[in-house]
Every structure is written in C-alpha cells, then in structure tokens.
Amino acid sequence: MLLGRRLAAMTELLKSVDYEVFGTVQGVCFRMYTEGEAKKRGLVGWVKNTSKGTVTGQVQGPEEKVDAMKSWLSKVGSPSSRIDRADFSNEKTISKLEYSDFSIRY
C-alpha cells in the first residue's frame, strides 16, 4: 500500500503557473493568506505586491493542488480582499520543482 502511494507520487504531474490577482488585494493581508494557503496545500513558489495595485506570483506543485490553488486565488483570497479577477499565464508541466518552499517577495 505504501509503495503504491510512493509510486503514484513519483508519477504525479507537476505543474507551474504564473498568476496576477486584480481587485482590492493590497493592504488586506492577501500575500500572507496566499503564503499560508500554498503551504497548507504543499505548494511552492512566491507572491508579491506590484506597483499597479495587484498581487502577482508563481505557484508549483502537483497538478490537482495547483488547480485548487488557482480556484482559491480566483474566488477566496484573504477575508478582507475583493477579487475582481485572476489571470493565469505560462501554465506548463515541469519535471521538478524550482523552489523549496513558498515565500513572500518584496
């Protein structure tokens, strides 16, 4: 049973996607909540504020977890945020993770 799970994990597709979230997403702890949600899901990557009032970043991990995080970024966010839309780009399958954890960039 354990061996089967380990084999499944080894063959699991890894995905990478860049994102930008628009709306009231700065000054509402959006980056902190994004970091917490990504870590809870076992994802790696980064998040940061932009000069144009959006939040941008990259997330990597197993395909279904990345897809769930995309949904969270599009619909949930931090409690005080108001998400107008989330744009996703450069979505691709990767052979290995490029980061060791998820971090807030400044």
From Swiss-Prot:
The active site is at R31, N49. The modification Phosphoserine is found at S100. Its EC number is 3.6.1.7. Residues 16-106 form the Acylphosphatase-like domain. It holds the Pfam family Acylphosphatase. Keywords: Hydrolase, Phosphoprotein. PROSITE patterns: ACYLPHOSPHATASE_1, ACYLPHOSPHATASE_2, ACYLPHOSPHATASE_3. It is an enzyme of class 3 (hydrolase). GO terms for molecular function: acylphosphatase activity; identical protein binding. GO terms for cellular component: mitochondrion. It catalyses: an acyl phosphate + H2O = a carboxylate + phosphate + H(+). Signal peptide: none annotated. Belongs to the acylphosphatase family. This is Acylphosphatase-2. The gene is Acyp2.
